[in-house]
Curated annotation (Swiss-Prot):
This is Forkhead box protein P2. SMART domains: FH. The gene is FOXP2. GO terms for biological process: caudate nucleus development; putamen development; regulation of transcription by RNA polymerase II. Transcriptional repressor that may play a role in the specification and differentiation of lung epithelium. May also play a role in developing neural, gastrointestinal and cardiovascular tissues. Can act with CTBP1 to synergistically repress transcription but CTPBP1 is not essential. Plays a role in synapse formation by regulating SRPX2 levels. It comes from the Eukaryota. Residues 291-304, 437-458 have a biased composition (Low complexity). Residues 698-714 have a biased composition (Acidic residues). The lineage of its organism: Eukaryota, Metazoa, Chordata, Craniata, Vertebrata. PROSITE patterns: FORK_HEAD_2, FORK_HEAD_3, ZINC_FINGER_C2H2_1. Residues 503-593 bind DNA.
Amino acid sequence: MMQESATETISNSSMNQNGMSTLSSQLDAGSRDGRSSGDTSSEVSTVELLHLQQQQALQAARQLLLQQQTSGLKSPKSSDKQRPLQVPVSVAMMTPQVITPQQMQQILQQQVLSPQQLQALLQQQQAVMLQQQQLQEFYKKQQEQLHLQLLQQQQQQQQQQQQQQQQQQQQQQQQQQQQQQQQQQQQQQQHPGKQAKEQQQQQQQQQQLAAQQLVFQQQLLQMQQLQQQQHLLSLQRQGLISIPPGQAALPVQSLPQAGLSPAEIQQLWKEVTGVHSMEDNGIKHGGLDLTTNNSSSTTSSTTSKASPPITHHSIVNGQSSVLNARRDSSSHEETGASHTLYGHGVCKWPGCESICEDFGQFLKHLNNEHALDDRSTAQCRVQMQVVQQLEIQLSKERERLQAMMTHLHMRPSEPKPSPKPLNLVSSVTMSKNMLETSPQSLPQTPTTPTAPVTPITQGPSVITPASVPNVGAIRRRHSDKYNIPMSSEIAPNYEFYKNADVRPPFTYATLIRQAIMESSDRQLTLNEIYSWFTRTFAYFRRNAATWKNAVRHNLSLHKCFVRVENVKGAVWTVDEVEYQKRRSQKITGSPTLVKNIPTSLGYGAALNASLQAALAESSLPLLSNPGLINNASSGLLQAVHEDLNGSLDHIDSNGNSSPGCSPQPHIHSIHVKEEPVIAEDEDCPMSLVTTANHSPELEDDREIEEEPLSEDLE
């Protein structure tokens, strides 16, 4: 066997060398083919490349074996020379693959290959390994590129899908909007007649309401004219006034236009105002005719013009004030542009107080701002409630007056002449039965309290029992006079005073004391006292400069108010002992109370004069102003403003009246202000000058000026 192998190796040594070269060339070619194939087709996998290399190596080994066999047959002698260069078949089979270290040792031990052949094999092996690494890297790169391409494609597809979805949504929204618009257009096309009909119906309803209101206003105006006509005729029959024929015929001419009989007008008047049935003969009851909407007016024999009627706000739905304003617009041109709702250039509508330069501007303001609307109606309803409360209080005050007169054992029929002529200024209404006692007609006198006019009469004018119960609402002072705590009167009507613009019937000193006593530590600063006034009474939320001056004056005037300096600053406290001493002096009639009375009249004489003048025999009729017979159904809103009780509060220079009313009971105590007659008029007889419709602004100013005199007396 050894000889055969040796001969084969010797004879085929050259062929082996050629085979090795061909093998290496084939391997190089295979590697080049692999590279070219890898370059051309990036999709060929490494597994296919390995198979391809193995197949090439097997083919090269087979060719090598075939060459060795053929060369061994041709030259067996040259095998000995070429033996060191012979490569066994097993090594040729291993060349394409990686040679392990064990195989290398076996090859070296057997000394089959020379060092050159080993180097060639190692180089070939390294080349193959490099090719494999390059192929693997290339494959990895290809895979990454493919993966990136796939990701990009997926992202693009997702974006396209999202865009498609958005487009679909937009299309759907557009379709929905188009459908809605089409539906609206269809509805508008289907229902144009309904909207027009609704508008026409609304316009018709508004026109009907306006027509009804106009008819109602005309009827009310005609009723008022009829009532005024009837009242003037009754006064003319009594011989109290003389009415020219032309003036009396004006209301009569307007009656046939209404198309209503007097009975129908009277029934409509009852339904509107809610008053009781008309009394045909109001003289029998010794009071006023309750059906008159305006105050009864009388004129003197020398003047032919009647005084303007006094209207009130107690008509339902707030229509009386507007109608009265329209009714009076013609008569105001003749009577010097006077109106109940207009005084001193200011509109007297509740809560208005707009400044009007002249009467024409006032009429425009009244027709524009206070027309028949919801606001005016609500204000009139509030005024109606105030009047109802005042009527209830009036009945109580009448009972109280009768009880007082019974207690004092004063008979009105006892004639007691007055020791000295006095000018008694009082706001007293008169009844019709008193007008019957004397046919004398009286001159018209101004109604302002600042310039009283004393008409010449044949004897002293007196207050009769028939006129006393008809006294209107006045400012009351009984909380101080009768030692009744103020808190017991304010508490039940706290909400009323807080919301209604009504003057509280208390002195400033009493209010200041109440504010301090209600505080937690019984002390208040001046600003805190102001805050209490505005918080408790709605009346003090206006005219701040007027009443704040009065508060400061009272604080500095009265000894019962003590100024204390503390951490808060200057605070005011109440000396209760001094306050009670002041009250006791006022009740017992201390001589200091009569310091304003002239020395010629003592306290007793002044008291007797006031009571005797008030309760003397009614020998002569009570002199009156034509505009002072108020409507009893309105609660006698025109008030008495002066004090009759000289023994309790002899001179009340601070007692002004407010145009509002108070919800408290006992508000109608009678006050008569006694004033000495001026020197040149001492020979003139005593008279009563009635006053009404005081201006709140003038009275507030008057109160500030007279405060030093009044507060010491209280």
